[in-house]
Amino acid sequence: KRLRRNKQLCAWLLADDRPQIVYAREVDFSHQQHLYGLFANRRAALQMLQSLADEQRLCYGLLGLEPLSRGRACFRSALGRCAGACCGKESVEAHKERLLAQMSRLQLVCWPWAGPVALEERGPDMTQYHVIHNWLWLGAVDSLNEAAALTRLPAGFDQDGYKILCKPLLSGDYPLHPLG
C-alpha cells in the first residue's frame, strides 16, 4: 500500500517567544530543531495548541492564538482560564517552561546520522538490510553492497515513515550500518 503524501503537513516551531506553524514543504522536518507534533493541517495544529492551553491555563495571547492588548490581561485571565502571564500574575518564563514541558512529549527527533543507514534485520534463514535516510525507507536488500546503491533520496518528509521507523532506529535493538 502506498503511504500518504500530505502537502499541508505542519508542526509547531518553538524557537522564539511565540510558537509558529511551519510546513514540511518549506522546512526540512528531518533536520530542523525545536519542532513539535505532526499535524495534517493548520486547523489540527491550532486545535491541539488550544486544547493544551485550556488544560494548562496557558495564555492564548502569548501563544499567538488571539490578539493581546499591551498592558492588559487577556479575557481568559478574567475568567480564570489563564494563569496570568499576560498581566504579570505569572512570569513569562514560567509560562514558557509550562508550555515546553507539555510540548516536549510531541518533539520531533532530528535525523541523527550524517547520511543513510542500513538497519540489519536477521532471521533464521536470511538477513535483510532496510535502507533509511531522513526517516524515509528507501528499500530492502540482501547485502550492504546493494544497500549503497539505494541512497537516492526523494524530496519531502514522510510522516508515516517517521512514525514507523523512529522507534526501531533509536531503540538499539537492531544493528545499524552507516552508508554515507
What are these regions (language model features)?
Residues 1-180:
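Conserved catalytic/ligand-binding micro-motifs in nucleotide and anionic cofactor chemistry
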